[in-house]
């Protein structure tokens, strides 16, 4: 997992 992917995944889950 790339470091940039980690924050993006959190944002996506937070949006849901």
Curated annotation (Swiss-Prot):
Keywords: Plasmid. It comes from the Bacteria. This is Uncharacterized protein in morA 3'region. It comes from Pseudomonas putida (Arthrobacter siderocapsulatus).
């Amino acid at each position: 997992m790339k470091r940039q992917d980690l924050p993006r995944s959190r944002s996506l889950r937070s949006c849901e």
